[in-house]
């Protein structure tokens, strides 16, 4: 079971990010994700769910297209703090992506996106520093601790159940009613084994 299946089983209309294997930020990443959002957007704002680097992309996308984004949920994403020290895989990322982690190939927005944001983080992550995934109070609307390792956030059933439930609770809190799940799409950008 993975995060997309867990969301679909809970009634969400789920759409993968459609960019294949995530090899880091590229000059056209946000443009391609913007097009993907346009394909999914049908007049109802879209919930963006992103794991690890995918969560950082989701936040950037929300900065650029807030009128199309319902909320952003990040799963163990290192969006806060010093990008040089907030993850144990910085050197690997830089080799794979071909650029310094602090110099992505597109301008990076600062601060919290202008939409509701929910951050999932774990003390046991092992890849991303807990404080980097939790964020500061001015960077996120709600931060929820999950008891899992980094990959467990998108694969481990107890974590998946908790994440789906917390997303629904969060949306109920900000919208004043339980989410009409079928009325919203979800883009999940994460490391995929094959192109969609």
Residue positions per predicted region:
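Short, hydrophobic alpha-helical segments
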Residues: 37, 163-175
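Catalytic histidine neighborhood in serine/cysteine hydrolases
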Residues: 138-153
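Catalytic histidine-centered segment of alpha/beta-hydrolase-like enzymes
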Residues: 26, 149-158
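Short alpha-helix in the alpha/beta-hydrolase fold that links the catalytic acid
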Residues: 3, 129-136
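Post-His helix in hydrolase/transferase enzymes
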Residues: 30, 155-168
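Serine-dependent carboxylesterase/thioesterase catalytic core
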Residues: 2, 9, 13-17, 26-116, ...
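Alpha/beta-hydrolase-fold serine-hydrolase catalytic core, especially in secreted/extracellular enzymes
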Residues: 173-196
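Acidic catalytic loop of the alpha/beta-hydrolase fold
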Residues: 122-128, 151
């Amino acid at each position: 079971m993975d995060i997309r299946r867990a969301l679909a089983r809970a009634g969400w209309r789920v759409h993968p990010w459609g960019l294949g294997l995530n090899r880091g930020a590229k000059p056209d990443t946000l443009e391609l994700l913007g097009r993907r959002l346009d394909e999914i957007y049908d007049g109802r704002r879209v919930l963006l769910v992103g794991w690890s680097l995918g969560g950082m992309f989701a936040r950037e996308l929300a900065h650029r297209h807030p009128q199309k984004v319902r909320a952003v949920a990040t799963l163990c994403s290192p969006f806060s703090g010093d990008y040089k020290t907030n993850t144990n895989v910085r050197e690997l990322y830089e080799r794979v992506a071909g650029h310094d982690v602090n110099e992505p190939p597109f301008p990076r927005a600062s601060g919290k996106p202008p939409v509701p944001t929910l951050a999932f983080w774990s003390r046991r992550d092992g890849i991303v520093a807990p404080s980097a995934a939790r964020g500061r109070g001015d960077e996120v609307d709600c931060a929820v601790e999950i008891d899992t390792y980094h990959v467990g956030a998108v694969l481990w059933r107890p974590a998946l159940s908790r994440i789906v439930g917390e997303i629904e609770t969060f949306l109920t809190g900000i919208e004043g009613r339980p989410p009409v799940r079928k009325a919203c799409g979800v883009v999940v950008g994460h490391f995929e084994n094959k192109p969609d």
